[in-house]
């Protein structure tokens, strides 16, 4: 909120008189609006025409104190409590103070922004002595700052809810924050101002500030519940008072409870009704707690509250019972501040009928006899009357009696005696209770009269006697009787014993005894039988009282039991056995016979025996001699009945004791794959079962309890897991039981994946020689076609093995190579697959030894260096060959003395690539500008290349400028850079249209590009195009052969010749606006040449000297950085050195190709690797690609990298792991010096020893 500005002015002029009368009103307006303007006195002191009077301002407003000086040229400043504020309008040290007004008019008003309590002081306007007047000091002006209270601290805490009890006295305190003047504090309770307030004014936290502490005494009433108690603070600095308040929660007791009885007769209710009594209590904070009591005991403590209306509800729900008669129901209400409980009660008057009627005495009696009965009711209110009914006829009671009952009720009793007759049988006998109080209800008790008399006739219905019934037939016998009460019981008997159903559920349900059924006056009971042998000739009878009837059944049944008896229980091979078959009982008699496994046996008859169930018995015997093959076989006895056409059989199983015998299906050989599991099965027969199975392998017994890799199963089989090839062999099994022993021999054939045991790596051969790559494996099984060979490489066309012979015999495979060629060198993989995964893979390198081949892309190579004896030059000679190569150097045909300190040679070996770097220090034009020859030699021959060391010069013209694409408006160009003279070079294209005079020039960007698309051409126009190379020493000239080309653009309708080239383009400058522009350029050039001819020589010599000095300084101080840049440029097209370069001459053209942009696809050389790693701790540097090779006809660049890749093979597993199949170009990126801590088996091939 921005500060408010107050302006105070005053002078002894007419405006001052007009304002003075309004001063009180202005002051009031300023205090209420936040603006403070100093009143101006009616008369100003001498020397002043306007001064402020005392002023009061609110904190945070802007105040202006007026000071009008009659001598404008004087130095005027203000003083605050005697402290001079200075004449500077900005008043350093007082950022809120400043002087305002027109000094020429003598206005020096003090403006105070955002005033605070520190500005409450006395101020003087002081005028310094000047030519126009003496020193002057104004009267003191007092500035009073009003500070409003920022906060009120209320106790209890503001914003909270305070709980009080109505009628009690409480103290509330309110403390204001710092203010000036002291604020006034007022308390407001529920909208009413509290008068009983005491206040104290105390010093504030700072000087001139005050705080007010007020205390009020409050006696709350119930009407204050939910209202606010507010503390208001005010002082002149506030537009509106500040407030703090809390909410009063007043506790007071509720009103009395009220019960709302449903109906007019309070307390009268009938038993069985669901009574709902609501009880309500109004008012109270907290709302009332309600509970119901019955005869002084709580029955319900559940209630609900409507807080908005402060009403508590509780409903008593009960089912009225007779015992509730006279009960007192009470509803009580109270809360936490109640002095006691308030209660409302109701007494119940319960009406209830008799809960039951009982008839005492027996209603069963023989005909023509008296029956005496008594009818008795339960207690009722009011009493009831009784009457008797027999069917629809009322009977008169003998006497009636009334007695007192429970719960204030009465008991009624009536006695009755009458004579029973046969026709009264089955009639209902009823005792009825009635009363006027229960007019709509009837209460009665009924019994059925039972008059007893006997049955008249009894008989049985079923199969006729003497009829044959087959066993298992379902027979139904029915016993019938007429008349009788009670109903005849109809009891069945079998041979004088009562018939009953089986009691056990598991017994076969052969007898089903029905219940007595009644149809009119006829009674029946059914007996269903599943006929069996025990029913043969049995007598079945039915009885009802003194009456009885019977019948007899004849049953046909096969042998009830066929038993085989043996003369011996323990049999051994060769023992004699006598078996007897006995048929216990059958009807009619049966024929017996014997057979063994379907073969009929001769038998003899035995002595007959008596038979149960009134049937016939039979027996026959057979004689046998047993063997071990009979064990478990059966001999069967068959009993056949012709009449029944049924045969009953029984068998005897041989139990022959004999020692173990191995069966014919016993397996003798088992095959398993290594690391798998196998089961050696056992097929043995023995009785008793073998007591032990003992396995031995190679003379060692296997533990019967099992081991880490074997377990003997309960059947004797041997289970092996994690089988290894060491488990291959014969296993002997020894079986034993109590009768003897037996042995068997089983062979385990373990198949395992092949493992390469011998693979000569590397395998060496001279070019044109013959060699066998031999691969020897350990495998099982050995298969004729398990060997295969692969050649590893990047070019698919170089990987076929059609020119090689594959031979295998047993565990050895051979790849036979005849007339070896260089192209056959490289990595070969022997793959062995015998059907057990995984296949074995072994990597072997074929090293084809050949004579040195020096990389010499052109007949002559040039290296540029300054010949001022301050710079150095490096000659790079690289050759390929196996075995190792030795280098020699000559200069102009004379062997170079490498003992000369100016010559330093470094040699590096990377696979088949060998390098020699010759560094010449302090190059001298007289001594070192010569033709150097590098010769590479090994045991198979030698080769050489020539390198010419020349001076730094202008670049050679580019070569091979040709058109690669053409369109109506553009021409695509391509060329080869020439020798750059040892300095960075750039290219410029000059072209002209033959029909239009004048030339146009275009700079090629980027500067290293060797392709460019010239655009902005006209269709159907012939152009002549030149290519120019330049460096810091000049350009290559335009008159040399092969740097210009003529071309005619096609018409707009013709298709472009080649659209496949995507070359960098740059729009050439547009055609000159004036045709004479080329002429003007030519004239200007002549004028410049005439002026420059005088100083050309001097500048040329100074430039050469400067270049030489720079080369010398950078050679001595930063040779390593310079050489690294050259290496990085060659390898990654980085920054280039400007003082040395390597170029090679063209084969036909005498011009030179620049080697800076030539990057053959070869693996990094060993010296390049050592350049980054350092060599033997020597602090030196050498160039990377100072002399780069150009592709030769014998193979593409990079083809040498993977030919001699290292093979890393585990001594125990010669298979080539997939994780070791790395990029072959990175195998030789280390040197032996850096590998002292590496195991010998992990060294690259060429570092394990020489090939010769």
Swiss-Prot record:
Pfam family, one: fn3
Topological domain ranges for the Extracellular compartment: 36-1078
Positions of the Fibronectin type-III domain: 957-1052
InterPro entries tied to this protein: CD80_C2-set, Cell_adhesion_signaling, FN3_dom, FN3_sf, Ig-like_dom, Ig-like_dom_sf, Ig-like_fold, Ig_I-set
PROSITE patterns: FN3, IG_LIKE
Protein species of origin: Rattus norvegicus
Cytoplasmic-facing ranges: 1100-1252
Protein known as: Nephrin
Name of encoding gene: Nphs1
Positions where Phosphothreonine occurs in the chain: 1115
Residue numbers carrying Phosphoserine: 446, 1112, 1119
Tissues/organs with expression: Strongly expressed in the podocytes of kidney glomeruli (at protein level) and at lower levels in the spleen.
Transmembrane segments: 1079-1099
GO terms classed as biological process: cell adhesion; cell-cell adhesion; gene expression; glomerular filtration; JNK cascade; MAPK cascade; myoblast fusion; positive regulation of actin filament polymerization
MF GO annotations: alpha-actinin binding; cell adhesion molecule binding; protein domain specific binding; spectrin binding
Biased composition (Basic and acidic residues): 1113-1127
Induction description: Following injection with puromycin which induces nephrosis, down-regulated by 40% 3 days post-injection and by 80% at day 10. Also down-regulated by HgCl2 with rapid decrease at day 3.
């Amino acid at each position: 909120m921005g500060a408010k500005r107050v302006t105070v002015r005053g002078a002894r002029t007419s405006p001052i008189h007009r304002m003075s009368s309004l001063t009180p009103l202005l002051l009031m307006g300023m205090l209420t609006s936040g603006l403070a303007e100093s009143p101006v006195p009616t008369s100003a002191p001498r020397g002043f025409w306007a001064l402020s009077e005392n002023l009061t301002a609110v904190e945070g407003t802007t105040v202006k104190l007026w000071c009008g000086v009659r001598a404008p040229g004087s130095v005027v400043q203000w003083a605050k409590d005697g402290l001079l504020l200075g004449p500077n309008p900005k008043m350093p040290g007082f950022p809120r103070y400043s002087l305002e007004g027109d000094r020429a008019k003598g206005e020096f008003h003090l403006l105070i922004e955002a005033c605070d309590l520190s500005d409450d002081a006395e101020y003087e306007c002081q005028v310094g002595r000047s030519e126009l007047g003496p020193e002057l000091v104004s009267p003191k002006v007092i500035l009073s700052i009003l500070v409003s209270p920022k906060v009120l601290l209320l106790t209890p805490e503001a914003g909270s809810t305070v709980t009080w009890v109505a009628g009690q006295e409480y103290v509330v305190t309110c403390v204001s924050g710092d203010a000036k003047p002291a604020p006034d504090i007022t308390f407001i309770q529920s909208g009413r101002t509290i008068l009983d307030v005491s206040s104290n004014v105390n010093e504030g936290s700072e000087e001139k500030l005050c705080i007010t502490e007020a205390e009020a005494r409050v006696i709350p009433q119930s009407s204050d519940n939910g209202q606010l108690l507010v503390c208001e603070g005010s002082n002149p600095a506030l537009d509106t008072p500040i407030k703090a308040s809390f909410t009063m929660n007043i506790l007071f007791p509720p009103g009395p409870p009220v019960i709302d009885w449903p109906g007019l007769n309070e307390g009268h209710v009938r038993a069985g009704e669901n009574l709902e009594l609501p009880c309500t209590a109004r008012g109270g904070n907290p709302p009332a707690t309600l509970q119901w009591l019955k005869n002084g005991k709580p029955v319900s403590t559940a209630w609900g509250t409507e807080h908005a209306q402060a009403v508590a509800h509780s409903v008593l729900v009960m089912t009225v019972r007779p015992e509730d008669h006279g009960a007192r129901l009470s509803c009580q209400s109270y809360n936490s501040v109640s002095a006691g409980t308030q209660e409302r009660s109701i007494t119940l008057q319960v009406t209830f009928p008799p809960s039951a009627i009982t008839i005492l005495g027996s209603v069963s009696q023989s005909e023509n006899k008296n029956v005496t009965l008594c009818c008795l009711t339960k207690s009722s209110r009011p009493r009831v009357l009784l009457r008797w009914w027999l069917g629809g006829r009322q009977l008169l009671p003998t006497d009636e009696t009334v007695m007192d009952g429970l719960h204030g009720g009465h008991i009624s009793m009536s006695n009755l005696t009458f004579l029973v007759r046969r026709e009264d049988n089955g009639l209902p006998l009823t005792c009825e209770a009635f009363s006027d109080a229960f007019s709509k209800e009837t209460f009665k008790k009924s019994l059925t009269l039972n008059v007893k008399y006997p049955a008249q006739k009894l008989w049985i219905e079923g199969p006729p006697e003497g009829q044959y019934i087959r066993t298992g037939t379902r027979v139904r016998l029915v016993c019938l009787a007429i008349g009788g009460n009670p109903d005849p019981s109809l009891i069945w008997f079998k041979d004088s014993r009562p018939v009953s159903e089986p009691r056990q559920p598991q017994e076969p349900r052969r007898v089903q005894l029905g219940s007595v059924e009644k149809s009119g006056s006829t009674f029946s009971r059914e007996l269903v039988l599943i006929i069996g042998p025990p029913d043969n000739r049995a007598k079945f009878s039915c009885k009802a009282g003194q009456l009885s009837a019977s019948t007899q059944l004849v049953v046909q049944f096969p042998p009830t039991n066929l038993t085989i008896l043996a003369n011996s229980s323990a049999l051994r091979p060769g023992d004699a056995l006598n078996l007897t078959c006995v048929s216990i009982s059958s009807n009619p008699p049966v024929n017996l016979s014997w057979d063994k496994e379907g073969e009929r046996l001769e038998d003899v008859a035995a002595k007959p025996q008596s038979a149960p169930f009134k049937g016939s018995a039979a027996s026959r015997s057979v004689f046998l001699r047993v063997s071990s093959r009979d064990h478990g076989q059966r001999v069967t006895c068959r009993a056949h009945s012709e009449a029944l056409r049924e045969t009953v059989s029984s068998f005897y199983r041989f139990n022959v004791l004999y020692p173990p015998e191995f069966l014919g299906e016993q397996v003798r050989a088992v095959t398993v794959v290594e690391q798998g599991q196998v089961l050696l099965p056992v097929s043995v027969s023995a009785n008793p079962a073998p007591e032990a199975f003992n396995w031995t392998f190679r003379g060692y017994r296997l533990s019967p309890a099992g081991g880490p890799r074997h377990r003997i199963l309960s059947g004797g089989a041997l289970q092996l897991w994690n089988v290894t090839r060491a488990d291959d062999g014969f296993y002997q099994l020894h079986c034993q039981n109590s009768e003897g022993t037996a042995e068997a021999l089983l062979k385990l054939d373990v198949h395992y994946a092949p493992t390469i045991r011998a693979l000569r790596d590397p395998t060496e051969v001279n070019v044109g020689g013959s060699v066998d790559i031999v691969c020897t494996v350990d495998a099982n099984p050995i298969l004729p076609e398990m060997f295969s060979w692969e050649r590893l490489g990047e070019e698919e066309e170089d990987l076929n093995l059609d020119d090689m012979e594959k031979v295998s015999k047993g565990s050895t495979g051979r790849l036979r190579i005849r007339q070896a060629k260089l192209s056959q060198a490289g990595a070969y993989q022997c793959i062995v697959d015998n059907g057990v995964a995984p296949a074995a893979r072994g990597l072997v390198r074929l090293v084809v030894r050949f004579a040195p081949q020096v990389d010499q892309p052109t007949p002559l190579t040039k290296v540029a260096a300054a010949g001022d004896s301050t710079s150095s030059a490096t000659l790079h000679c690289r050759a390929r060959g196996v075995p190792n190569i030795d280098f020699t150097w000559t200069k102009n045909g004379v062997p170079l003395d490498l003992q000369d300190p100016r010559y330093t040679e470094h040699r590096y070996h990377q696979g088949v690539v060998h390098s020699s770097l010759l560094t010449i220090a302090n190059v001298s034009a007289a001594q070192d500008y010569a033709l150097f020859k590098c010769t590479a030699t090994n045991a198979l021959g030698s080769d050489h290349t020539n390198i010419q060391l020349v001076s730094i010069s202008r670049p050679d013209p580019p070569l091979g400028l040709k058109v690669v694409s053409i369109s109506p408006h553009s021409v695509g160009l391509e060329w080869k850079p020439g020798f750059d003279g040892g300095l960075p070079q750039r290219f410029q294209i000059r072209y002209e249209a033959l029909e239009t005079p004048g030339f146009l020039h275009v700079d090629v960007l980027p500067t290293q590009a060797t392709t460019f698309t010239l655009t902005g051409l006209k269709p159907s126009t012939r152009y002549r195009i030149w290519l120019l190379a330049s460096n810091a020493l000049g350009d290559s000239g335009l008159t040399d052969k092969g740097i210009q080309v003529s071309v005619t653009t096609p018409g707009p309708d013709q298709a472009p010749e080649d659209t496949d080239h995507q070359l960098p383009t740059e729009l050439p400058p547009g055609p000159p606006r004036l045709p004479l522009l080329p002429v003007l350029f030519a004239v200007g050039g002549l004028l410049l040449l005439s002026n420059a001819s005088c100083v050309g020589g001097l500048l040329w010599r100074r430039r050469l000297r400067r270049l030489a000095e720079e080369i010398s300084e950078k050679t001595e101080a930063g040779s390593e950085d310079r050489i690294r840049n050259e290496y990085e440029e060659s390898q990654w097209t980085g920054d280039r050195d400007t003082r040395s370069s390597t170029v090679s001459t063209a084969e036909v053209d005498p011009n030179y190709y620049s080697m800076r942009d030539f990057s053959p696809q070869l693996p990094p050389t060993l010296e390049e690797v050592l350049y980054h790693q350092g060599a033997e701790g020597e602090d030196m540097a050498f160039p990377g690609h100072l002399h780069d090779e150009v592709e030769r006809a014998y193979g593409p660049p990079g083809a040498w990298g993977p030919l001699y890749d290292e093979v890393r093979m585990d001594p125990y597993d010669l298979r080539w792991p997939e994780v070791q199949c790395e990029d072959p170009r990175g195998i030789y990126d280390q040197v032996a010096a850096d590998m002292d801590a590496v195991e010998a088996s992990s060294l690259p091939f060429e570092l394990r020893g020489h090939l010769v």
